[in-house]
Amino acid sequence: MLVNARAIRQSIGIVVAQCRRDLESNRTLDYRTRMRTSLILVAMVMVSVLLPYTYGSSCDSFCTEQANKCLTGCEGFVGCMECTNFAGHCREQCRKRSVKRRKEIRARFTKEPTEES
């Protein structure tokens, strides 16, 4: 799933960069082409901003599943506590990664476009 998400983000970045270049460099584009390019740009930015939110909600289900697998083989109180602690730690780390991803993506799209040589 992460590999697919990374590929999606990379392809979104490529399409967004191409749309920006089209809109900035070629001012003689006809109206339909400009509108289509603008709509693609807006759609891609929306998808890339919303994509990390799906991972945030999947943290709970993934971590709960891992903890339940651990608990099925749980023998004794100490082992059960380790499983419970693992689930909490897993959720915390997963959410931190999701927040970090959202910030990176927002920063990428709020930067001023740079001129490529």
Swiss-Prot record:
Positions on the Extracellular side per record topology: 57-117
Membrane-crossing residue ranges in chain numbering: 37-56
Residue spans, topological domain Cytoplasmic: 1-36
Domain of life: Eukaryota
Subcellular localization: Membrane
Keywords assigned by UniProt, alphabetized: Disulfide bond, Membrane, Transmembrane, Transmembrane helix
Major location (coarse): membrane
Modifications after synthesis and translation: The mature peptide may be cleaved at a dibasic residue site and be shorter than the sequence shown (possibly residues 1-94).
Keyword Cytoplasm included in the entry's annotation: no
GO-annotated cellular components: membrane
Protein name (Swiss-Prot/TrEMBL): Protein Aeq5-like2
Organism annotation: Nematostella vectensis
